[in-house]
């Protein structure tokens, strides 16, 4: 165990991961100080660089459970049973995520979650300093300078160890990279996103089905909508950066309204502020960040988006970051020194982060192109039947990622095996009537051992 005299940590970023890690470590006896470049969201209008609604899955709930804060968070969450797919023509169809209401995900607004976790971090004993933007780090001397952007005043601290929970544009990562290159690679998607809002009905109720993630798939672009506790939906349009239509061709609110009238007609009456929202909100970038190294000896380590930002299409960015928090807290308890803890943390989490980054990109293609594809729907039907027959062996991809604690890397390995089985078994078929069940059973028993936690 790390000596008591060394048990002081400074966390850069008081967002979701930073606040949760502060709770976990404060309760383990660490002296925790958080530094946040923005103001306190509890006393000022919430400002976030990225506010796509968050999908809370079992991995994230498990981390909240371990921190003892699950009940407080879940009071603000809205259940989503599945994807409500809105075709161009015809009625919306619900594609369930799991078998029943024990297998669902939850929508929560970033600001609600952040303020809740901040309150609980302070209650656990952490100290939070707002308006502190990391400017300079001297890793050898254990010295850091922060700037208050309200008046450009400097604030200097001495530190033992820094933890970077400051997001995809991490200032700590930049400082570490200047000291010794981290092997940083950022691959931006050729799509960006823009956020809009469906307000509540006049009586305060939800205007569309509240317990679903709504998707309007349209090939190379799509809309999604996630419910909020107060009756609103956060709508996100994902559109190419170039081509027609794209963010290069849809510039004005009037052009956006015409796009929605043509492609997402049933949403148009639901978004009364479409024109104004379009012109006020700039498009957000979508990218995948990979690093060769997440830590610098025992002086600094990165977690969450600061280490492995991903595209949001599997709803796992926050869940993965929360798993990081639990893993780092565990390694800090088990290791004899900080460098050993950070190295063990990186060795455990990096392969899993790479796996969910890949699966998030693949899920984008599925959501955008395949949820209305008959071949894909037949594979989904077969997947559900195989799960019914062999529930502990053939576990659907979404179940492994969202409802179990299967390491992401293992979930990816099994997913690729199962995908090959589904494609091979359904090729040339338009129903399950002539499926070779005996051959599939032999394959499943040979290639898919019983999965821990499956039932």
Curated annotation (Swiss-Prot):
Q: Which Pfam families match?
A: FAD_binding_3
Describe the reaction catalysed, as an equation.
L-kynurenine + NADPH + O2 + H(+) = 3-hydroxy-L-kynurenine + NADP(+) + H2O
GO BP: anthranilate metabolic process; kynurenine metabolic process; L-tryptophan catabolic process; NAD biosynthetic process; quinolinate biosynthetic process
EC number from the UniProt entry: 1.14.13.9
Required co-factor(s) are: FAD
For this protein, the record's SUPFAM superfamilies field holds: FAD/NAD(P)-binding domain
Recorded GO MF terms: FAD binding; kynurenine 3-monooxygenase activity
Q: Which keywords fit this entry according to its UniProt record?
A: FAD, Flavoprotein, Monooxygenase, NADP, Oxidoreductase, Pyridine nucleotide biosynthesis
- Function as written in the Swiss-Prot or TrEMBL entry: Catalyzes the hydroxylation of L-kynurenine (L-Kyn) to form 3-hydroxy-L-kynurenine (L-3OHKyn). Required for synthesis of quinolinic acid.
Query: What protein family is recorded?
Result: Belongs to the aromatic-ring hydroxylase family. KMO subfamily.
Name of this chain's protein: Kynurenine 3-monooxygenase
Organism annotation? Stenotrophomonas maltophilia (strain K279a)
- Whichever gene encodes this chain, its name is kmo
């Amino acid at each position: 165990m790390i000596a008591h005299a060394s048990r002081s940590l400074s966390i850069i970023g008081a967002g979701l991961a930073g606040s949760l890690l502060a709770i976990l470590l404060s309760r383990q006896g660490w002296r925790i100080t958080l530094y946040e470049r923005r103001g306190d969201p509890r006393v000022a209008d919430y400002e976030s660089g990225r506010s796509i609604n968050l999908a809370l899955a079992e991995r994230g709930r498990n981390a909240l459970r371990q921190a003892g804060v699950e009940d407080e968070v879940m009071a603000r969450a809205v259940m989503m049973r599945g994807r409500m797919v809105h075709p161009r023509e015809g009625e919306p169809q619900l594609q369930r995520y799991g078998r029943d209401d024990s297998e669902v995900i939850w929508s929560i607004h970033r600001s609600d979650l952040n303020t809740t976790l901040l309150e609980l971090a302070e209650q656990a004993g952490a100290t939070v300093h707002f308006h502190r933007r990391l400017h300079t780090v001297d890793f050898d001397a254990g010295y850091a300078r922060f700037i208050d952007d309200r008046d450009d005043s400097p604030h200097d601290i001495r530190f033992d160890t820094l933890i970077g929970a400051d997001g995809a544009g991490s200032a700590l990562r930049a400082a570490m990279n200047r000291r010794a290159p981290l092997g940083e690679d950022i691959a931006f998607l050729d799509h960006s996103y823009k956020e809009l809002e469906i307000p509540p009905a006049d009586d305060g109720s939800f205007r569309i089905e509240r317990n679903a993630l709504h998707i309007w798939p349209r090939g190379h672009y799509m809309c999604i909508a996630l419910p909020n506790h107060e009756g609103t939906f956060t709508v996100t349009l994902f559109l190419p950066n170039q081509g027609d239509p794209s963010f290069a061709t849809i510039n004005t609110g009037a052009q956006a309204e015409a796009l929605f009238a043509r492609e997402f007609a049933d949403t148009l009456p639901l978004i009364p502020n479409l024109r104004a929202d379009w012109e006020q909100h700039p498009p957000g970038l979508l990218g995948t960040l990979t690093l060769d190294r997440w830590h610098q000896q025992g002086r600094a380590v990165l977690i969450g988006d600061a280490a492995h930002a991903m595209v949001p299409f599997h709803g796992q960015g926050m869940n993965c970051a929360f798993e990081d928090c639990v893993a780092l807290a565990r390694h800090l308890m088990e290791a004899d020194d900080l460098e050993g803890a950070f190295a063990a943390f990186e060795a455990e989490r990096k392969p899993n982060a790479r796996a969910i980054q890949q699966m998030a990109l693949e899920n984008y293609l599925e959501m955008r192109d395949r949820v209305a594809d008959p071949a894909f729907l037949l594979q989904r039907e077969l997947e559900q039947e195989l799960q019914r027959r062999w529930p502990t062996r053939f576990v659907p991809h979404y179940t492994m990622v969202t409802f179990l604690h299967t390491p992401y890397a293992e979930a990816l390995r099994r997913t690729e095996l199962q995908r090959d089985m589904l494609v091979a078994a359904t090729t040339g078929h338009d129903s399950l009537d002539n499926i070779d069940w005996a051959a599939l059973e032999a394959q499943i028993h040979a290639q898919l051992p019983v999965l821990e936690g499956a039932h």
